[in-house]
Amino acid sequence: MAPALTLEKPVETNAFPRKAASVETSENYEGNYKFAPIEEAQVSRAMIKRYFNTMYDRAISDVVIVGAGSAGLSCAYSLATQRPDLKITIVEAGVAPGGGAWLGGQLMTPMVIRKPADAFLRELGVPYEDEGNFVVVKHAALFTSTLLSKVLAKPNVVMMNATAVEDLIVHEDFAGQQRVAGVVTNWTLVALNHDTQSCMDPNTITAPVIVSATGHDGPMGAFSAKRLVSTGLLKELGNMRGLDMNRAEPAIVNGTREVVPGLILTGMELSEHDGSNRMGPTFGAMIGSGHKAAHEAIRILDRHKVVNGKVVA
């Protein structure tokens, strides 16, 4: 678990630099609300310039996190907080980040988090009801939206959502080992339609550390773990076992690690790799596993020499 941090003060609107509008505007809600004028091309260029500048810059990243569910976002928050010098790039296949953390079990809204993971809620400023051995957030979206907003506010974090990881970059490293050296990406709509169209080649992001947090459900579930098998880096999957909350959560947190050089598995993806139990609608392990993945990523970076996104010593 990451050490407790002082809560960040909310950013006030007047802290942002403002340029004067070219014409008079008005926030009069009595029928006289006036916007500053804009050209359609200005909107397009404003988006394109920033997005593709981000793609250009993050073609080499320090850490890529695959999946923006509760484990991936917890990892991103912890990592960005501890190491603001790192370029952290989150790749999320869904249009809406958050994975399965927008609801609790069976589409119900409350979220259950076992102690001691409740410390993270206090760090984020998320209110909850204390039930003794666990706490309950009144709506899972309160936790997820708070965490997501804080992650995206970190200046060293970018997220590319609606973007799927289609493959892993695997190179022989300085020691002669096969090492995961980055990810292969594409628009999710393209990735899901390779059977309907031809020749839609992907893009790449190079990074010395990949944290895969793709869960176990859905079309992209446990993607990296499954790809390790098909590439021959892993003999077979352990396959997730049946539900046992008391066995599952500590197994996921304690088992979070670098499973092959350059690739850390976290969250429920690890259960498919290791053959551990599922825990169902309790989220403490996702927080703890994400934090441990951040610590593992820092440990890997600290013990290797990295040049242009590649581990060289």
From Swiss-Prot:
GO cellular component terms, semicolon-separated: cytosol; nucleus
2,3-didehydroalanine (Cys), modified sites: 199
Post-translational modification: During the catalytic reaction, a sulfide is transferred from Cys-199 to a reaction intermediate, generating a dehydroalanine residue.
InterPro entries: FAD/NAD-bd_sf, Sti35, Thi4_fam
Subcellular location: Cytoplasm; Nucleus
Keyword annotations from UniProtKB, A to Z: Cytoplasm, Iron, Metal-binding, NAD, Nucleus, Thiamine biosynthesis, Transferase
Any GO BP: thiamine biosynthetic process
Catalysed reactions, semicolon-separated: [ADP-thiazole synthase]-L-cysteine + glycine + NAD(+) = [ADP-thiazole synthase]-dehydroalanine + ADP-5-ethyl-4-methylthiazole-2-carboxylate + nicotinamide + 3 H2O + 2 H(+)
Residues at which substrate binds: 71, 92-93, 100, 165, 201, 216, 268, 278-280
Cofactor note: Binds 1 Fe cation per subunit.
GO MF annotation list: cysteine-dependent adenosine diphosphate thiazole synthase activity; iron ion binding
Residue ranges of coiled coil: none
Top class in the EC scheme: transferase
EC number from the UniProt entry: 2.4.2.60
Cofactor list: Fe cation
Family matches, as Pfam families: Thi4 (PF01946)
Domain of life per record: Eukaryota
Subunit structure: Homooctamer.
HAMAP family with a match to the protein in the record: THI4 (MF_03158)
Function: Involved in biosynthesis of the thiamine precursor thiazole. Catalyzes the conversion of NAD and glycine to adenosine diphosphate 5-(2-hydroxyethyl)-4-methylthiazole-2-carboxylic acid (ADT), an adenylated thiazole intermediate. The reaction includes an iron-dependent sulfide transfer from a conserved cysteine residue of the protein to a thiazole intermediate. The enzyme can only undergo a single turnover, which suggests it is a suicide enzyme. May have additional roles in adaptation to various stress conditions and in DNA damage tolerance.
Family stated for the protein in its record: Belongs to the THI4 family.
Descriptive protein name: Thiamine thiazole synthase
Source organism: Coprinopsis cinerea (strain Okayama-7 / 130 / ATCC MYA-4618 / FGSC 9003)
